[in-house]
């Protein structure tokens, strides 16, 4: 085993260790080292999933914080507590700085290493979907021209992923389904296009249902889970009380159908 291979193996092991300890920032660092190894070529499915899980947890914690703080900010604004609102805005902007930094980190890695080195259709869709996801996370909190740019970048990445997925991946493939799930969430939440969101989600669900009997045992669980999430969102979006925003919109959470 060459020194590079040994160090790659060690970083993967350390990333798994960090995951067990729920130290996701360090998990990101270990997996970035693996991804940046010059002669690495394409990441294995396991490595790709570890990288995805690491970033998912790091960004997920901040996204949850941002939503909570934004909700409190709205309540205080409606009560007219201007002094509190100013403090909340400042605190929210600190979280937004962290969110921007995390998104910029993975987007740079995707552009410099992961997307260019991807050869298999599955890998290309996985990374382009990931690229769309992190641009979408930027669009969630940016405003004005920055939000417009983030939304445009999201659309381009998801469309590129979709073109490959429709041509080369089975309708029941967890990554293809995860892409449809997150792409539809983007249409609904960021572009405010409920019709397009519903059409995309329904098409993906119906196409997969038609081919369900061809599913292998290993991906059956992943695929049916994402199909359930597609259906949950469709139910939420088409119901009369969709406007109340009481229920949480579902996104792909597992790396095989990665996203969220």
UniProtKB/Swiss-Prot annotation:
Gene3D superfamilies: 14-3-3 domain (1.20.190.20). Keywords: Cytoplasm, Nucleus. Residues 241-260 are annotated as: Disordered. Its main location: cytoplasm. Residues 247-260 have a biased composition (Basic and acidic residues). InterPro entries: 14-3-3 (IPR000308), 14-3-3_CS (IPR023409), 14-3-3_dom_sf (IPR036815), 14-3-3_domain (IPR023410). Induction: By wounding, drought and salt stresses, benzothiadiazole (BTH), ethephon, methyl jasmonate (MeJa), hydrogen peroxide, abscisic acid (ABA) and incompatible and compatible races of rice blast fungus (M.grisea). Signal peptide: none annotated. GO terms for biological process: protein localization; signal transduction. It is found in: Cytoplasm; Nucleus. It holds the Pfam family 14-3-3. Expressed in seedlings, roots and panicles and at lower levels in flag leaves and internodes. It comes from the Eukaryota. SUPFAM superfamilies: 14-3-3 protein. One of its GO terms (cellular component) is nucleus. May form a complex with the transcriptional activator VP1 and the bZIP transcription factor EMBP1. Belongs to the 14-3-3 family. Is associated with a DNA binding complex that binds to the G box, a well-characterized cis-acting DNA regulatory element found in plant genes. This is 14-3-3-like protein GF14-F. It comes from Oryza sativa subsp. japonica (Rice).
């Amino acid at each position: 085993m060459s020194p590079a291979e040994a160090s790659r193996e060690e970083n993967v092991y350390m990333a798994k260790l960090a995951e067990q300890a729920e130290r996701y920032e360090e998990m990101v660092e270990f997996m970035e080292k693996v991804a940046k190894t010059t002669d690495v070529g394409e990441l294995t499915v396991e490595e790709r999933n570890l990288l995805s899980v690491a970033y998912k947890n790091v960004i997920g914690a901040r996204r949850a914080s941002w939503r909570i703080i934004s909700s409190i900010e709205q309540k205080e604004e409606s009560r007219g507590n201007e002094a509190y609102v100013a403090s909340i805005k400042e605190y929210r902007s600190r979280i937004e700085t962290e969110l921007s930094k995390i998104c910029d980190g993975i987007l740079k890695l995707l552009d410099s290493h992961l997307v260019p080195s991807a050869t298999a259709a599955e890998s290309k869709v996985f990374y382009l979907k990931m690229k769309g996801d992190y641009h979408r996370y930027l669009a969630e909190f940016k405003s004005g021209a920055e939000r417009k740019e983030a939304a445009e970048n999201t659309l381009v990445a998801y469309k590129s992923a979709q073109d490959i997925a429709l041509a080369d991946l089975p309708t029941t493939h967890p990554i293809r389904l995860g892409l449809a799930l997150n792409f539809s969430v983007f249409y609904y939440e960021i572009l405010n296009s409920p019709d397009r969101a519903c059409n995309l989600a329904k098409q993906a669900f119906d196409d997969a249902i038609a081919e369900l009997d061809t599913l292998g045992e290993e991906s059956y669980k992943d695929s049916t889970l994402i199909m359930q999430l597609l259906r949950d969102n469709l139910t939420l979006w088409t119901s009369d009380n969709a406007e109340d925003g009481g229920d949480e919109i579902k996104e792909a959470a597992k790396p095989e159908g990665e996203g969220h």
